[in-house]
């Protein structure tokens, strides 16, 4: 899946409360990426960080620059495993299944330990 010739990286999920609408939140995410010197040179290639909006409550959003739920979220254990840690009962609105129901074990995904 994607570009594999790159260093190991961390994936994490956070849950936030915001009064921003989805487009404003996306703009905030992209601005943060730019401020931290994100370069988009290779699709799915190495990066300093990548901020995605996985879910926005129970909304389904299809716009030119934003799809929520994230369209490849359900295929990616490296997304679902950390998301399950914080939102196991959260419903993914397209499948109408909880994150806990969608996540499958994947030995290639390792939890970070200090």
Predicted regions and their residues:
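Flexible, gly/pro- and Lys/Arg-enriched active-site loops
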Residues: 1-10, 18-114
């Amino acid at each position: 899946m994607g570009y594999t010739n790159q260093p190991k990286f961390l994936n994490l999920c956070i849950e936030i409360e915001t009064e921003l609408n989805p487009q404003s939140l996306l703009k905030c995410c992209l601005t943060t990426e730019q401020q931290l010197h994100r370069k988009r040179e290779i699709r799915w290639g190495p990066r300093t960080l990548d901020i995605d909006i996985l879910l926005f409550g129970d909304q389904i959003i299809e716009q030119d620059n934003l799809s929520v739920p994230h369209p490849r979220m359900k295929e990616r254990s490296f997304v679902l495993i950390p998301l399950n840690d914080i939102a196991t009962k959260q419903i993914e609105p397209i499948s109408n299944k909880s994150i806990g129901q969608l996540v499958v074990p994947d030995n290639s995904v390792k939890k970070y330990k200090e």
